[in-house]
Design a protein with these regions (language model features):
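Short, exposed "boundary/linker" segments that immediately precede the start
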Residues: 1-8
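Non-catalytic structural scaffold of enzyme domains
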Residues: 9-220
Length: 220
């Protein structure tokens, strides 16, 4: 949902919607409707556009696949963004409804996960045998990457978003030094959550494999 003003007194200049479904459904509305009213100096960035920008230099066949949640696939955000930059690229997507539950319930590396990982990959490749690049269109999915790579043919490149989104933000700051100079650089991280801290810490440890500082907040 759109950001509430209670979130923006915190001192970060940027919000990254590190969720493909949120980026697909809410980013434009947040940027166009909410930020001008809350604080026009702040920025909210998504994860879909930075991922798409790299594709043109990677795919050789000009056929790519998207593995994502139902919300992201239904939004058609990936085909729309791809065709803005690369009209010649063919895009096919498949929903993977079991992948997020596998990650969030810490079942990603269990043998039972193999069935669902193989199932959705096969569905995608049956749609288009010329696919040579697959985007993991959900920020949960990199935790499944070791198993995904077991079932993806060797000639297909798998794109996890993290490094591309990070490089895009770095490039943004280089192009906007007036924003970069306002950013603190003390290498500290504080996580805010709207759910119970212990539940958040348990989930975050799966992703980050480190101790984190968490503060619970309430959206008004």
């Amino acid at each position: 949902r759109p950001p509430r003003s209670t979130l923006f007194p915190y001192t970060t200049l940027f919000r990254s919607l590190a969720c493909n479904t949120a980026s697909a459904k809410a980013l434009r509305s947040i940027q166009m409707n909410n930020l001008p009213k809350i604080d026009p100096e702040r920025r909210v960035l998504g994860v879909i556009r930075p991922t798409v920008e790299c594709i043109g230099n990677i795919t050789q066949s000009r056929h790519i696949g998207i593995l994502a949640t139902a919300g992201t696939i239904k939004s058609e955000s990936y085909p729309l963004e791809v065709h803005k930059l690369y009209p010649d690229i063919q895009v096919n997507g498949v929903t993977c409804p079991m992948w997020v539950p596998l990650v969030e319930n810490n079942e990603a590396q269990n043998e039972g996960a193999d069935y669902f990982i193989r199932k959705y990959i096969n569905q995608l490749l049956q749609k288009d045998s010329q696919i040579d690049t697959v985007i993991l269109g959900c920020t949960h999915y990199p935790l499944l990457l070791p198993k995904i790579q077991q079932y993806i043919p060797d000639n297909i490149r798998v794109i996890a978003q993290g490094e591309y989104v990070a490089e895009s933000l770095k490039d943004y700051l280089c192009r906007h030094p007036e924003m970069d100079i306002k950013c603190t650089k003390n290498n500290s991280c504080l996580f805010y959550t709207t759910e119970a801290e212990d539940k958040f810490i348990e989930s975050a440890s799966t992703f980050l494999n480190q101790q984190i500082n968490v503060k619970r907040i309430t959206l008004e």
